[in-house]
Amino acid sequence: MGSTGEPDRKRRLSSSVAPGGGAPVSPAKRLAVAPTSEDKKLDFTVLKYKNQKLSEQLEAHKFEYRALENKFAGLKEKQRTHNETLSLVNSSWEQLVADLKSRSFCKSGSPNSSPGSGHNNVQKDGTCAPIERDTLRSLVESGATESSGCLPGCHLGSDAPPLHLSTANALGDIFFPSSDLLQANEECALAALTKLPENDRSKQLQSTSSNLLSSLNNVVQALSNLQLKHKQLAEDYQNQRDSSARKRAEHRRLKEELASAASELEETNYKLAALKAQRDNTQGARIPYPTLGNKSMPEDKVRDKQREMQDLEATHKELSELISKRLVEIKRLHEERIEILNKIATFQNILMDFKSIRSSKAFQLVNDRLQKSQAELDHYQTLLEKLQVDKDKFVWQERQFNLKVDLAEIPERVSTYCESSIADLKKDIQKLRDEKNMLILKLEEASREPGRNQVITKFKALVSSIPREMGAMQSEMTKHKEASLELNSLRAEVHSLSRILSRKERDNEEASCRSARAGSDITQLQSVISDLKQTNKELKLFADMYKRESTDSREIMESRDREFLEWAHVHALKSSLDESKLEQRVKAANEAEAITQQRLATAEAEIAESGQKLGTSRKDLVSLSHMLKSKQEECEAYRVEVECIGQAYEDIQAQNQQLLQQIIERDDDNTKIFMEGVKAKQTQDALHLETYSLRRNLQQESSLMDLYNQKIVSLEDQLKMWSDRVGKLQEDGWQQSVSLSNYQRKLVDVHRDAQKLMQSLDGIQANVGSSRLEVADLLIELEKERFSKKRIEDDLEVMSRKASSLRAKARESAVLEKLRHEVKEYRGILKCGICHDRQKEVVITKCYHLFCNQCIQKSLGNRQRRCPSCSLSFGANDVKPIYI
């Protein structure tokens, strides 16, 4: 209705207010523009109110977000503690698995526990025998590795290997070799007992074996009990884990409910803001102004306006009802929010109360179970160590038994070896006898041959000439060594001379630099002297010029002469002073130049001498290098000769051996005598060496005795020092014991203070809990006050809007009266000026005066056709109709 009536109203207003195109703006139009500015002010206040509401909602959301952040931090801390306990359990379990693996490795490392020792417990394809497989399956199914399956690492997927497989492998490594070992030991024991004779030792062995079997059965029973307890612990841990999962699910559900409640609250806030905006728009709508025209408003239009007003009132009632419902919902949500804040505060206090956490049943149960599991783990570890010790003892006994068996087989092997060695020795003796007979025959043949004395003399001459040649060669080698040493010394001298030459060159360069500096100083001084001379000449010229001037009076001339004399005296003094300084500088420079020239001359002489020495040393070096080359060539020739002589000597030695063999074969008596003489000489030399060594040892022992005496003296001094230090250390120990007792007393006091502090901490925690509850109550009260304040502000704003709307209505009523009066005036203007009843319908084009058609027709019927307003004559063609 309102949307269809708006264009009609605009059309009526445009048709009624446009009598002419260039007419000025009427006052009604100016008044019609005023309410738009008021609407803008109302819109601005509405926007300001909305912004305020949105800021308050933002603050509330921030508070909720902070509360949720605190809750999330508490839950995160709880999760961290849970993760720490879980990591501790995981580490203990991994340590247990590692210990099991190490035990299994120790078991598999025994010599008789290998899978290929001849037992039938392991099949060819590497799979275990049915007994071990059933044992492992029963262990895994009964829960020996369930706790490892409960760890977080087992839920990582197929990529991460589950821990229960490692524990199963470790248990398999322990149980399978132990079963193989038990079976092998049983077989060995049965075989040994069957082979042993029936006596006391065999009975003792049987009794010990039965005792070992009973102890092994006890260990197996203990392991089964350990398995049952482990299964119970795994079930308890699984139950605890299920309960923690349920708690996490409950926590997740509560978080989702909180998020949904927050989202619903946001939606309701958004809807409420939209409804408030609609209400503000309905309250701030403009009152439709009556249209202007030359006739009264029709009844159907009035009815349409009434219907529109009724519809607006109905919508206003609906909106007010909806607003009341939304306010009730907001109150309910506010109460729910306060309840949630109370719950969050209580949860925070519960989570942050360490005393209640420590005193909680779950924490105590977990702590007791951990302690029990730790004690059981230690107990079972000791049992496992005992089992390992028993196993080692059993392996040692088995080794001793095998050693005895091997010792029983040793005599048989020794007898067979002795028989074979006797047969080999008989064969060797027979071969030696045959060789002896052959040598006897060869000696007889050699004794019959002539020329034996000549061979002996040649051999003796050759032997006597060899040491002379060796002495000559050694003397030549010593000469060559001396020459090489001289060459090294000459090289060292050349290096030293080159260093001296480089040093002299550096000194020469420094002296040349100094002389250059002195020359530059001299040139500077000479330039200064020339400048001073020029200034002196100029001053003299100025003095002559002033003397020649005679234009002034006599007194002025006298004063000027005096002044000139004084200035001349001053300049003379300055010049004398400068000349004296310059003379001193010139003298010093000349002396320095003379000294530098002397040094330069000495340096040049030294450079020349060093150059001559360098040339001579280079020449000597060249000659020595030539000599060295020649000596090296000679050494190479001597080496070749020595090698040739050595080869000849080796050949001669071979011939000598052949000749000696021939001589020995020909003449046994001579060789025997010669050997006896050689032996006598060797014994004499050995005796001389022994006497010399004894003397030397005696001297060394005497020197050692002196050293030992010195060491004894030093050790006595050290003993005195150590005794003094021990006394000091005893005193320090006594002082430390006193200080330790003091520290222990302080420690007891500190423990007491710590207990007091713990008690005070408990009290403080209780106070903190109570203060937190008080803070939560204060927050709730603050929230209530904020809510009531918001309600009051909303009511105040509604009342202010009502007051503003009433003021606007009052203003609009006054404006309506004015408009009605103006409408009457405009209607009077639009009515005909002759009859004052009908509307103006025609215009006289000569004077542009408006009248109704009937009055103009009456004037046209008369003879005098004149305008009633200006009495201007017009014709029928001058009358034109208009449409207003």
From Swiss-Prot:
Record remark: domains: The RING-type zinc finger domain mediates binding to an E2 ubiquitin-conjugating enzyme.
Low complexity bias (residue ranges): 108-121
Keyword set, alphabetical order: Chromatin regulator, Coiled coil, Metal-binding, Nucleus, Transferase, Ubl conjugation pathway, Zinc, Zinc-finger
Coiled coil: 49-86, 216-541, 580-663, 696-762, 789-827
Region Disordered, residue ranges: 1-37, 107-127
EC number of this enzyme: 2.3.2.27
Class in the EC hierarchy, top level: transferase
Pathway(s) the chain acts in: Protein modification; protein ubiquitination
Any one GO cellular component localisation term in the record: HULC complex
Role summary: E3 ubiquitin-protein ligase that monoubiquitinates H2B to form H2BK143ub1. H2BK143ub1 gives a specific tag for epigenetic transcriptional activation and is also prerequisite for H3K4me and maybe H3K79me. It thereby plays a central role in histone code and gene regulation. Forms a ubiquitin ligase complex in cooperation with the E2 enzyme UBC2/RAD6.
Main location: nucleus
RING-type Zn finger ranges: 832-871
Gene3D superfamilies for this protein: Zinc/RING finger domain, C3HC4 (zinc finger)
Originating gene: BRE1A
Reaction(s) the record says it catalyses: S-ubiquitinyl-[E2 ubiquitin-conjugating enzyme]-L-cysteine + [acceptor protein]-L-lysine = [E2 ubiquitin-conjugating enzyme]-L-cysteine + N(6)-ubiquitinyl-[acceptor protein]-L-lysine
Alphabetical list of SUPFAM superfamilies matching this protein: RING/U-box (SSF57850), Tropomyosin (SSF57997)
Name of protein: E3 ubiquitin-protein ligase BRE1-like 1
Family designation: Belongs to the BRE1 family.
Location relative to the cell: Nucleus
Gene Ontology MF terms in the entry: protein homodimerization activity; ubiquitin protein ligase activity; zinc ion binding
One GO biological process term: chromatin organization
